[in-house]
């Protein structure tokens, strides 16, 4: 890891801890030896109030390259019961399609090195709103087809997934109960 990436990620962690938006989590993953992996962060984005995603707690991962912050982190939602989040702008792998985390000149990317992790997470939360879906940039065929051809069926599927990732819901975790590779979701 470069010195710039290391110092920037440490600064991002300090800043996030000081001004963490309610319900959000962003912290380096824990390695088997107990140390922190600054290049891989486990995050939680709460569904925005007043949207279909309200009440959901969506686990995701941010992976940083050694040239961060020159390049954006790769952001992806954890799978929910082995399936991607039912959203037209989320790839089947869980990767999030959002201009703020795409390099400039790539797929309408608007990434700048000054973009903070907190801003990324808030933008991802905003994407979890039916009004913010970008049908011109479909990443997931099934979700796109439902969204454009049978909106009620799409809403039903979203509500089912939200129920799976709502604390106290069917599983209480975004990865089907186990919390995925990073363990259970723990809000700090």
Locations of the language-model features?
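Short, ligand-facing micro-motifs at secondary-structure edges
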Residues: 22-29, 85-86
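Conserved, non-catalytic sequence blocks in retroelement Pol enzymes and Pol-derived host proteins
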Residues: 29-35, 48-52, 108-115
